[in-house]
Structures are given as structure tokens and as C-alpha cells.
């Protein structure tokens, strides 16, 4: 039985007449959508561009049709078949064979891909998230380039650096990467697909022409990486260069660096697909996890879990790991599953309300996640890796950590300070005043020393002075209309600060 794709927790018991009605409605919706997509394609005049657009719309229609069928079928997972993964389905990093003398040979067969489709809007920035300054004047992109350059120089190899952009990030990224032209690194870029947003009520596409406004389209999640790699021709380019393996990760995960032991393990085990997982903490209980489903390895996301089993899903005892989205692919195998139409990843219906031509409209975006493809590859399994390989920067709370004395940069790689006790990062929660990078920088112009910090919470209008040290648990709360200025040189240890404290400059 297949792992069902969607918000799963509904029990369906339909009569034959209800099924017949649903099937008829599904057929009509599919037929109408097909006509609309054909109309969109007819608005493209250039023959080559039209062919590429038609291919994209065919892929979208396949996704849309599957969505309709699953919606009518009302399928859900059978929780009785869900088990913790077997030892061979998730291998411990400490047990895999260390890379030996063949490292250079294997590296010559490797390419590195960063998912670069996202904007920096959630952190208050304009343009691709990858160009946000992270540390010492370096952006996410800069750090990635430095890592690959060092790898190529150290082993005398040529590992290409590949960026999967979206239509939101492609133009800005093309301008930025020009500065690397003199560097010893081959940079390849391609775009993930551009799919039409769909009206929730009518199930019709929002755009009326292929060049309709940008807000009428969406990038369909990183599960699109397989088809986009193939359709763009990048996969053929890499294979022609002798590349067989691809390491894929989010560009904002500063821990996702090339690991020779994992590459060696992939080659030695003939794995077509590897997923890096790491141990859950209380902060990660909602993350997707690998399961044994009726004897097969599957990715399970919280949205797929029936409501009565959500707490069990969050259990660290039964499901110890979560997906870091550091993935390793065997390129010829990717080409095979795409060309044979074997991919059938779980669909994530992203329903939202957007502003369109001055009005609010309800839309659906059909997305997929690359981790869900694990069940389509041979010898695919997970590797439980150290936490250091998962260091995402999603918020300014994360940014404070990576800018601090907790970490240092070595050839583009972010490494934890060996003087940090326990080797884990403190828990940092910054309030709404710190949501945007510009506001964060204004309130904390100089990053405090946090080597001995366990927990930091700051809410309200709080300003941190220079050369401040934070230790233990520190909570600073400025209530409405109040402001707290932490003086230069302060040492705060295991304290709670509330109220109003203004420091006047003389």
C-alpha cells in the first residue's frame, strides 16, 4: 500500500454514487484545466520558448490531475503499517566507512547543488535570500563558493557548483555571480519550474497568458529539482563531464558541506539516494521523519499524520530523527526515474489568500518536497548525521548565533567554537522588533559574547550595547512604550530584566 500524500486524517466511506459524482467532477475539472493550459501555451509565439513552456505545463497538469484524483479518493495512511525505521533504513554516521585513498576519484564524480529559489522577505530583505550578509561580510552564496573553491584546491579536483534558482531569484543571482568569474570554480545555474497559481473555488489557473504578472505564478517546491534538472539539460551536462553524484541542500543551511565519508558510503553501498537526518530535539518535533511503511522506507510529514496520532509522531522515542534536507542523488538514476515517469511524490497543497489586482483571492499552490522521492530509488536510505550538519538560518535569532563568538569561519565553513561546552547552540528567541535584518542590526549593532549562554529571550524595544557578555539564562522584556538599553560592557548572567532603562549618551 502506498503512503498517501495529503492532509490525511480524514476517514472516507463513500457510496458508489458519491464516487461516481466525484469521478465525473474530477474529469470535468481536469478537462477544463487542460483547455486553459493549452490556451496559455498558445500565447507563446517563439517556437523554442513555446516547446519549453508546453513541457512545463504538461508537468503541471500531471501534478494537478493527481491532486484531483487523490482528493476524490480521500486516501490516507494506514497507521498500523507505520513503524520506526529499521537499522538498515537509517545508518548511523559513526558506523560508515571513513573515506580513504579514493576520495579524490569520488570527488571528481561529484557536483554540489544549492536550492536558491527563496527570497529574503521573511527576514525583511529584498532579493534572493542567498545574498543576505551572514558573517564577516560574506553572504550565504559567498560562503558556499569559498567551500567549493577550497575543496577543489585541496584535492586538485573540479567539483561544479550548481544553483537551482526560481523565477523570483534568477535575474538577481545572475548579476551577483559575475563577481566569481575569476575564481577557480565552475558555476552552473538553471531555473526550477514556473507553475500557474490556481483559483481555489473554480480550480482554474489565475494567469490568462504566459507572460502574465509574476504574482500569478509560483515555484512548486524543491521536489521539482528532479524534473527541472532533466528538462533544463543540466543533468546531461553534468553526466557528460563525468559527474555521477549530486549533493543537494538548502543554501541557508550553513552546516551542509561536502562530507567525504558520506560520499564514500554512497558509492560503496550503490545507493541511488541518501537523506541526511539528525536527532530530534524539542524544537524539531514537527519535522519530517523517515519511517518503515509496510517494509519500505518513506518520508512522513506531520501534515500526513491522522490527528489522533500527532503526539505519537512527535515522540522522540519512536521517531528519533528528522530530515535535514541534505540529500545525495545518483545522477543516472535521477534521469531514469524522470524519463520513465516513475516519480509520484506526495503533494503538498499550499492554500493561501493573496492580493491580486486590488482584491483578495483564495488560491492553491501544488508543491512537492525532494525528500518524498526517497521511495522511488534503489538502495535508498537515511544517514543519522551529527547536529553540526544542520545549521539553518531562517530568522534573525539564528543570525545572532552564527554572527557570534560561538562560531568561526574556516574556508567558508562555519565551525563551532571548541570552547563551547556540550557542543550545542543556546536557545535564542528574539521578538518582533528583531524580525527584519535592518531592525536586528539597529538594536544589536555589536553581537554579544554568548559562549556561556544557555537561553536568551528578548522582546520589545531593547538595544544591546557593545562588548556585552551573556551567560546562563537571560530574559529581557521591554513592555509597551518602554525601552531598555543594555550598557556597553555589561555582563548579564542568569537574570531577568523588565521595565524601562534608558542610557543617555554624553
From Swiss-Prot:
GO terms for cellular component: cytoplasm; cytosol; nucleus. It comes from the Eukaryota. GO terms for molecular function: metal ion binding; UTP:glucose-1-phosphate uridylyltransferase activity. It is found in: Cytoplasm; Nucleus. This is Probable UTP--glucose-1-phosphate uridylyltransferase. Homooctamer. UTP binds at residues 115-118, 129, 192, 221, 252, 394. The active site is at residue 394. It is an enzyme of class 2 (transferase). Its EC number is 2.7.7.9. Mg(2+) binds at residues 129, 252. GO terms for biological process: glycogen metabolic process; UDP-alpha-D-glucose metabolic process. Gene3D superfamilies: Hexapeptide repeat proteins, Spore Coat Polysaccharide Biosynthesis Protein SpsA, Chain A. Residues 455-506 are annotated as: Oligomerization. Plays a central role as a glucosyl donor in cellular metabolic pathways. Substrate binds at residues 117-118, 222, 250-252. Keywords: Cytoplasm, Magnesium, Metal-binding, Nucleotidyltransferase, Nucleus, Phosphoprotein, Transferase. The modification Phosphoserine is found at residues 15, 17. It catalyses: alpha-D-glucose 1-phosphate + UTP + H(+) = UDP-alpha-D-glucose + diphosphate. Belongs to the UDPGP type 1 family.
Amino acid at each position: 500500500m502506498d503512503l498517501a500524500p495529503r492532509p490525511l486524517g480524514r476517514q472516507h466511506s463513500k457510496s458508489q454514487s458519491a464516487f461516481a459524482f466525484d469521478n465525473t467532477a474530477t474529469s470535468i475539472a481536469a478537462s477544463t484545466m487542460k483547455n486553459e493550459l493549452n490556451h496559455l501555451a498558445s500565447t507563446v509565439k517563439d517556437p523554442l520558448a513555446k516547446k519549453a513552456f508546453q513541457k512545463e505545463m504538461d508537468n503541471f497538469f500531471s501534478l494537478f490531475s493527481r491532486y484531483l484524483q487523490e482528493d476524490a479518493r480521500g486516501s490516507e495512511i494506514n497507521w498500523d503499517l507505520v513503524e520506526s525505521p529499521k537499522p538498515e533504513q537509517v545508518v548511523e554516521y559513526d558506523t560508515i566507512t571513513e573515506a580513504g585513498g579514493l576520495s579524490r576519484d569520488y570527488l571528481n564524480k561529484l557536483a554540489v547543488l544549492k536550492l536558491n529559489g527563496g527570497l529574503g522577505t521573511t527576514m525583511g530583505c529584498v532579493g534572493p535570500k542567498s545574498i543576505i550578509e551572514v558573517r564577516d561580510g560574506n553572504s550565504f552564496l559567498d560562503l558556499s563558493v569559498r567551500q567549493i573553491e577550497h575543496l577543489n584546491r585541496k584535492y586538485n579536483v573540479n567539483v561544479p557548483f550548481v544553483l537551482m534558482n526560481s523565477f523570483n531569484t534568477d535575474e538577481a543571482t545572475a548579476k551577483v555571480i559575475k563577481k566569481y568569474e575569476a575564481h577557480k570554480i565552475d558555476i552552473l545555474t538553471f531555473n526550477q519550474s514556473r507553475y500557474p497559481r490556481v483559483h481555489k473555488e473554480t480550480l482554474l489557473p489565475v494567469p490568462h497568458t504566459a507572460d502574465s504578472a509574476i504574482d500569478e505564478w509560483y515555484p512548486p517546491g524543491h521536489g521539482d529539482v528532479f524534473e527541472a534538472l532533466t528538462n533544463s539539460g543540466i543533468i546531461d551536462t553534468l553526466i557528460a563531464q563525468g559527474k555521477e553524484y549530486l549533493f543537494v541542500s538548502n543554501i541557508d543551511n550553513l552546516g551542509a558541506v561536502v562530507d567525504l565519508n558520506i560520499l564514500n558510503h554512497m558509492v560503496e553501498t550503490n545507493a541511488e539516494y541518501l537523506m541526511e537526518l539528525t536527532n530530534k530535539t524539542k524544537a524539531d518535533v514537527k519535522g519530517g521523519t523517515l519511517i518503515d511503511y509496510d517494509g519500505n522506507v518513506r518520508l512522513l510529514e506531520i501534515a500526513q499524520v491522522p490527528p489522533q496520532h500527532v503526539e505519537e509522531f512527535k515522540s522522540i522515542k519512536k521517531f528519533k530523527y528528522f530530515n535535514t534536507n541534505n540529500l545525495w542523488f545518483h545522477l543516472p538514476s535521477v534521469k531514469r526515474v524522470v524519463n520513465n515517469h516513475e516519480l509520484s511524490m506526495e503533494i503538498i497543497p499550499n492554500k493561501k489568500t493573496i492580493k491580486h489586482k486590488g482584491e483578495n483571492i483564495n488560491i492553491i499552490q501544488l508543491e512537492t518536497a525532494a525528500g518524498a522521492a526517497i521511495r522511488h530509488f534503489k538502495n535508498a536510505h537515511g544517514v543519522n548525521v551529527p547536529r553540526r550538519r544542520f545549521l539553518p538560518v531562517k530568522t534573525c535569532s539564528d543570525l545572532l548565533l552564527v554572527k557570534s563568538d560561538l562560531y568561526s569561519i574556516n574556508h567558508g565553513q562555519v565551525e563551532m567554537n571548541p570552547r563551547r561546552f556540550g557542543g550545542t547552540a543556546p536557545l535564542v528567541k528574539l521578538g518582533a522588533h528583531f524580525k527584519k535584518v535592518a531592525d536586528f542590526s539597529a538594536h544589536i549593532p555589536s553581537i554579544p559574547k554568548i559562549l556561556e549562554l544557555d537561553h536568551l529571550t528578548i522582546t520589545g524595544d531593547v538595544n544591546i550595547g557593545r562588548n556585552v557578555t551573556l551567560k546562563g539564562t537571560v530574559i529581557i522584556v521591554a513592555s509597551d512604550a518602554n525601552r531598555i538599553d543594555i550598557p556597553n560592557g555589561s555582563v548579564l548572567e542568569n537574570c531577568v530584566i523588565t521595565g524601562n532603562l534608558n542610557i543617555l549618551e554624553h
